[in-house]
């Protein structure tokens, strides 16, 4: 089948840490990472410029640790290191399927990754390399969703692809608990904020809205879905400033 022109030419894919854990839900499952890497490689081979942000929830969660008595700042820094571990594993899997990949971190660790430098990240993308951003934004209290929105704005990405485990979009209620839940095909960023739809945290949603970055929430467990989103197929939920607000 002949493919149309891509809707998005430069994307930032946001993966949860749990996406790397496979069925176990914790830790890192190498076969799962390799499967995701092949999906990304297929899209990259079509000339799409790709950056990644990966959460760290498969290895560590700062908020529960803080609630249990750990200093919140230290707990968040620990989580940032978890995102770097995930980034290094994903980078290795992408390298193994033939994709030149760089990891850039917001906390200096020169032995394993480049420091985050916007201009260098842009050059990597222009040269056909994938860039994975690790260690959040380098400061506590900010989520990896906010990292994704910030880095997407900085690299002038056309869209953030929120790749979800077994969730095929945004609903007005939890579809696992409410059989009458209705999926939204389209939303504005303001819809998301006003309705309290927790796709991303409010900081990330506002950043995406202010910088006019589309957000697509889709099920990553269906093979080929990343490509479908990039080429504009109507899957998942698209959040954009260029959509009429829902009542």
UniProtKB/Swiss-Prot annotation:
Signal peptide: none annotated. UMP binds at residues 56, 76, 137-144. Optimum pH is below 6.5 at low ATP concentrations and is 7.4-7.8 at high ATP concentrations. It catalyses: UMP + ATP = UDP + ADP. Gene3D superfamilies: Acetylglutamate kinase-like. It is found in: Cytoplasm. Its EC number is 2.7.4.22. This is Uridylate kinase. InterPro entries: AceGlu_kinase-like_sf, Asp/Glu/Uridylate_kinase, Uridylate_kinase, Uridylate_kinase_bac. Allosterically activated by GTP. Inhibited by UTP, 5-bromo-UTP and 5-iodo-UTP. Catalyzes the reversible phosphorylation of UMP to UDP, with ATP as the most efficient phosphate donor. GO terms for cellular component: cytoplasm. CDD domains: AAK_UMPK-PyrH-Ec. GO terms for biological process: 'de novo' CTP biosynthetic process; UDP biosynthetic process. Residues 22-27 are annotated as: Involved in allosteric activation by GTP. It comes from Streptococcus pneumoniae serotype 4 (strain ATCC BAA-334 / TIGR4). Pathway: Pyrimidine metabolism; CTP biosynthesis via de novo pathway; UDP from UMP (UMPK route): step 1/1. ATP binds at residues 14-17, 57, 61, 165, 171, 174. Keywords: Allosteric enzyme, ATP-binding, Cytoplasm, Kinase, Nucleotide-binding, Pyrimidine biosynthesis, Transferase.
